[in-house]
């Protein structure tokens, strides 16, 4: 697990500039040195595992996912399963003041080798395919930021007002052969403009439909605007929930766009192009400048 300070990438002045959420690292709120408390917490969790559990974690390659679950599940304010399955438990950047070492150590020590949660593995089966030139986005640019087993990220470059995805967690296997049930949860974004529909009874497949939307306050940090939709996927083996897997979509709110909802309920672009007012920052690696200097 890597730990990095956010250093001006997650602040009230410019908002949340991180393009995607992942369970592979922790981002600390603050600048250099803000990572130290989180590193200590991770070390304490590792030290608290029972020897037989730690051996089983090594054998299954599940040390990091289990540590991630414990760190997130035992933070200040995450006292229930409902709280864990919410955006507040999975922020972009973590505050040191939310670390609860005693709870983290206690949870780590309570996990037996037969109760280890699985690693959620995702795959996109279908998704809206924008047509370059027709849907107006940059030449040679893809809307796919990355696809990894536990994190999928997209950039909403096209002018389409609604996009959908069918995602599966069917490759997820419990290390001890337990039956699994899945929860798909909107962690951030406008709940009136995101719809998640499990396709199967156990939740291994889900259809996600998203409408264009404006920035929203970040969960747990309302003074920081977020330009991202995050959906968390959790597997429960009857004892513990897994660490989250994420589907993230970054919206380019530095662009001036206007959408209107048609009679069929689908948003359609009225105006696109140009810079939004307020000087919203855009990462030049994700949004290269056009020859006229605009993005």
Question: Where do the protein language model's features map onto the residues?
Answer:
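Structural beta-strand segments of beta-rich domains
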Residues: 118, 163-167
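Extended alpha-helical scaffolding regions
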Residues: 240-295
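Extended, non-transmembrane interaction/recognition domains
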Residues: 1-145, 149
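Low-complexity "stalk/linker" and mucin-like segments enriched in Ser/Thr/Pro/Ala/Gly
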Residues: 122, 133-134, 142-157, 177, ...
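Conserved structural position at the C-terminal beta-strand
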Residues: 235-237
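Short beta-strand elements bearing conserved aromatic residues within extracellular beta-rich modules
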Residues: 182-184
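Acidic, Ser/Thr
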Residues: 168-176
């Amino acid at each position: 697990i890597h730990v990095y300070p956010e250093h001006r990438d997650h602040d009230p002045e410019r908002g949340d500039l991180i393009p995607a959420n992942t369970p592979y690292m922790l981002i600390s709120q603050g600048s250099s040195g803000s990572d130290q408390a989180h590193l200590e917490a991770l070390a304490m969790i590792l030290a608290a595992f029972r020897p037989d559990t730690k051996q089983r974690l090594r054998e299954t390659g599940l040390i990091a996912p289990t540590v991630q679950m414990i760190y997130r599940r035992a933070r200040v304010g995450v006292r229930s399963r409902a709280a864990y399955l919410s955006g507040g438990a999975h922020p972009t950047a973590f505050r040191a003041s939310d670390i609860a070492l005693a709870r983290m150590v206690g949870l780590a020590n309570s996990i037996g080798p037969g109760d280890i949660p699985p690693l959620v593995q995702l795959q996109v089966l279908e998704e809206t395919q924008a047509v370059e030139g027709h849907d107006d986005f940059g030449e040679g640019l893809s809307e796919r930021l990355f696809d990894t087993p536990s994190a999928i990220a997209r950039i909403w470059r096209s002018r389409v007002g609604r996009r959908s995805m069918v995602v599966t967690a069917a490759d997820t296997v419990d290390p001890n052969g337990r039956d699994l049930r899945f929860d798909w949860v909107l962690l951030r974004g406008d709940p009136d403009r995101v719809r998640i529909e499990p396709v199967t009874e156990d939740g291994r497949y889900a259809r996600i439909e998203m409408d264009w939307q404006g920035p929203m306050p970040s969960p747990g940090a309302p003074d920081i605007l977020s330009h991202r939709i995050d959906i968390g996927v959790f597997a429960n083996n009857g004892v513990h929930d897994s660490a989250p897997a994420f589907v993230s979509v970054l919206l380019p709110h530095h662009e001036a766009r206007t959408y209107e909802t048609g009679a069929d309920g689908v948003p359609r672009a009225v105006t696109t192009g140009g810079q939004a007012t307020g000087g919203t920052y855009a990462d030049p690696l994700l949004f290269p400048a056009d020859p006229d200097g605009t993005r």
